[in-house]
Amino acid sequence: NRPFLVVRAPGSGSEGTGDLLALRGDICFPIEVKSSKSKKLYLSGRTFDQLEALRDVGNRCGLLPLYAYRLKGVRGDSWRIMKVEVDGLSGKLRHLSRSIPSLPLTRNGKEYLDWDKGMPLHRFLSLVCKSDGARTSVDSFPSSSIIPSMETVISN
């Protein structure tokens, strides 16, 4: 009922903006998009710096940064959503944050992406629609309606 404006950030991946910024009157998500053939993606160097910048922006601005992780070669819903842990969330973002899985930790306590531990995109969309007061169930997003383009999916 209430669409998102999705903006691709110029110089994406820098300054904590992530690759996409999904905006709606009541919520905003900076989103870092990653894809790989491997179910696990370890963050180091530039990718770890991106994570730290996302966390910093989330903490300073009261936003919920997300990772959208696509597993290449998977048919259907190949996207998984995970959140970056931040402090000071309020309102709907705080409520949504409780249901979205965090980035898992290695044995050394370092965050990484694990496709199996992420939330399927269709469930995330259902969750966001429910936060808008719409009556939407996970079953109302048939797999055929999932569009492979992340920018298109979130803006619908």
Language-model features: locations:
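Acidic-basic catalytic patches of nuclease active cores, encompassing PD-(D/E)XK
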Residues: 1-11, 60
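Hydrophobic/aromatic beta-strand patches that form the interior of the parallel beta-sheet core
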Residues: 7, 31, 66-68
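Beta-rich catalytic cores
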Residues: 16
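Conserved catalytic cores of phosphodiester-cleaving nucleases, focusing on short active-site segments
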Residues: 20-22, 26-37
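Short, charged, amphipathic alpha-helix that recurs within catalytic cores of restriction-modification
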Residues: 36-70, 74-75
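Domain-level recognition of nuclease-like catalytic cores that cleave nucleotide substrates
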Residues: 64-135, 146
